[in-house]
């Protein structure tokens, strides 16, 4: 019941032709393509930012661990 068949797609295409006319359909398709590309670029930027944050957190955690080990080694040498 919720599936799209070839008939549904053709019916939608005819409705778009009636509403927008054959001259505006290429412009509409081009605009939709640009919008989809922009959306995908935005998602990629979010992924890159999230990865950068994750990498920075790992480096910070590693630095804290190495500082703790350095302090322990210094205490052991002083004893």
UniProtKB/Swiss-Prot annotation:
Biased composition (Polar residues): 56-79
Subcellular location: Cell inner membrane
GO molecular function, one term: protein transmembrane transporter activity
GO biological process: protein transport by the Tat complex
Domain of life per record: Bacteria
Residue ranges crossing the lipid bilayer per the database entry: 1-21
Annotated segments matching region Disordered: 52-79
Keywords: Cell inner membrane, Cell membrane, Membrane, Protein transport, Translocation, Transmembrane, Transmembrane helix, Transport
Primary location class: membrane
InterPro entries: TatA/B/E, TatA/E
Membrane topology, as annotated: Single-pass membrane protein
Pfam families: TatA_B_E
GO CC, any one term: TAT protein transport complex
Family in the record: Belongs to the TatA/E family.
Record's subunit section: The Tat system comprises two distinct complexes: a TatABC complex, containing multiple copies of TatA, TatB and TatC subunits, and a separate TatA complex, containing only TatA subunits. Substrates initially bind to the TatABC complex, which probably triggers association of the separate TatA complex to form the active translocon.
NCBIfam families with a match to the protein in the record: tatAE
HAMAP family: TatA_E (MF_00236)
Role, per record: Part of the twin-arginine translocation (Tat) system that transports large folded proteins containing a characteristic twin-arginine motif in their signal peptide across membranes. TatA could form the protein-conducting channel of the Tat system.
UniProt name for this protein: Sec-independent protein translocase protein TatA
